[in-house]
Amino acid sequence: MTHWHITSWVVALILVFVSYGLYGSGKAKGAKITHMILRLFYIIIILTGAELFVRFANWNGEYAGKMLLGIITIGLMEMLVIRKKKGKSTGGLWIGFIIVLVLTVLLGLHLPIGFHVF
């Protein structure tokens, strides 16, 4: 299940950049399609993450923190794409997104079921 989770968030990250770029270039139809596919991947990420949490968490704070950071990351991804679609500024959101994404990945790598890089 870990591989499904990692694959889904990698694909979601790619889709965020594609949707963002398509909205920026004015290709609304293609952007809408990729945005809907991105939303499907949000659901997959949340479901696989919840399954990993229930299976391996032992109900400690690190796993709960990782889950919370993951949900915040998904929220920021969606906010980036929506604000670009509406033509609003996204500078601050990009900074917040990158910080939260890095924290989420680092915490995920630190946890026992992650890849043991650290």
From Swiss-Prot:
Regions annotated as coiled coil: none
Keyword GTP-binding found: no
Keyword Transmembrane annotated: yes
Listed transmembrane segments: 4-24, 33-53, 62-82, 93-113
Entry similarity comment: Belongs to the UPF0344 family.
Subcellular location: Cell membrane
Keywords: Cell membrane, Membrane, Transmembrane, Transmembrane helix
InterPro entries with a match to the protein in the record: UPF0344
Chief place where the protein resides: membrane
Protein name per the record: UPF0344 protein RBAM_010920
Pfam families: DUF1516
Membrane topology listed for this record: Multi-pass membrane protein
Origin species: Bacillus velezensis (strain DSM 23117 / BGSC 10A6 / LMG 26770 / FZB42)
